[in-house]
From Swiss-Prot:
Keyword set, alphabetical order: Magnesium, Transferase
Alphabetized PANTHER family for the sequence: 2-PHOSPHO-L-LACTATE TRANSFERASE
Chain positions recorded as 7,8-didemethyl-8-hydroxy-5-deazariboflavin binding sites: D58
Highest taxon of the lineage: Bacteria
InterPro entries cross-referenced by the UniProt entry: CofD, CofD-like_dom_sf, FbiA/CofD
Molecular function via GO: LPPG:FO 2-phospho-L-lactate transferase activity; magnesium ion binding
Enzyme class: transferase
Protein name per Swiss-Prot or TrEMBL: Phosphoenolpyruvate transferase
The keyword Transferase appears for this protein: yes
Family: Belongs to the CofD family.
Catalytic activity, EC: 2.7.8.28
Keyword Magnesium listed: yes
Length: 322
């Protein structure tokens, strides 16, 4: 099987690890080996201290490569923060985004390669040569695209980078809208459209539907390519609340209810063929979409592999019907 997964950060990375485990088990049972291509969100990317940081790409790379801080779900294991402490001592800003010493090395390599003229897709491939994540990891685009948030507070109406809204303010400042700066003129990275075209099916992990998967689908050409395939998604909402993070604040901003049904309808039956929901949402009905219920908390590797395996099973079933 050739599988394409659209992924954000923590939720996407953990789902991918479960997917790898599920496919490995199938191979042990005699099934043909499968390949996974991950199209990663780069809308969260930000330049800090002259370094280009790609949080979601790095989270996927570190998680699948065995270098992630498991407790946090982001950043490097065994991290230190000497450089950050020195920057704070110099009064450098921003101080709300903590770059660890090991993590900074990744950003230095990326930034030097960007300055030398290499595209982000080639840089990501080079970084993965070290981590060997066991998937083909592609950025959604080689062009610079950033998600900004229009907010209104005591400082007035202004646009701030998504990372500032998310990390510094914990999404507590009411947002008026999200703006994907640069997306309109961006092109899918090399290999993205061909990977989708050649895939047996596409999976949406329980990543943020607005600023992660939504950002990927917002690159011209990607949504249409995905819509032509069998697509199965895993709900990031359980019992009316996000599985993790603050996706409810993002959904509220675009006028979408925080529910498994509403997120599926936001994606649309023209895009989504199957939808996995938690048992708490077993009564979910989405017109034109096959809905299945199972425990969706990715509480341990076995449960995560079971969720990913169920998504694969549903995708194969729906593909067979089409």
């Amino acid at each position: 099987m050739r599988i394409v997964v659209l992924a954000g950060g923590i939720g996407g990375a953990r789902f991918l690890r479960g997917l790898k485990d599920a496919l490995h088990h199938r191979a042990e049972q005699g099934e043909s080996p499968s390949s996974i291509t991950v199209i990663g969100n780069t809308g969260d990317d930000i330049t800090l201290f002259g370094l280009r940081v790609c949080p979601d790409l790095d989270t996927v790379m570190y998680t699948l490569g065995g270098g992630i801080n498991e407790e946090q779900g982001w950043g490097r294991a065994d991290e230190t923060f000497t450089v950050r402490e020195e920057l704070i001592a110099y009064g450098m800003h921003p101080q709300w985004f903590g770059l660890g010493d090991r993590d900074i090395a990744t950003h230095i390599v990326r930034s030097q390669m960007l300055a030398a003229g290499y595209p982000l897709s080639a840089i990501t491939e080079a970084l993965c040569d070290r981590w060997k994540p066991g998937v083909r990891l592609l950025p959604m685009t080689d062009d610079q695209v950033e998600t900004h948030v229009v907010v209104a507070d005591e400082k007035g109406r202004r646009a701030i980078h998504f990372q500032e809204w998310w990390v510094r303010y914990r999404a507590q400042i009411p947002a008026e809208s999200f703006v994907s700066v640069g997306a309109d003129s961006a092109k899918p990275a090399p290999g993205v459209l061909s990977a989708i075209d050649e895939a047996d099916f596409v999976l949406f992990p329980p990543s943020n539907p607005v600023v992660s998967i939504g950002s990927i689908l917002g690159i011209p050409g990607i949504r249409d390519a995905v819509a032509a395939k069998t697509v199965v998604g895993v709900s990031p909402i359980i019992g009316g609340a996000p599985v993790r993070g603050m996706a409810d604040a993002c959904l509220r901003t675009i006028g979408v209810e925080t529910s498994a049904r509403a997120v599926a309808e936001h994606y649309g039956a023209d895009l989504l063929d199957g939808w996995l929901v938690d048992e708490a949402d077993a009564d979910t009905v989405v017109a034109g979409v096959e809905v299945r219920a199972m425990p969706l908390y990715m509480s341990d590797p076995e449960r995560t592999a079971a969720i990913a395996g169920a998504a694969v099973d549903l995708a194969l079933e729906l593909k067979e019907r089409s």
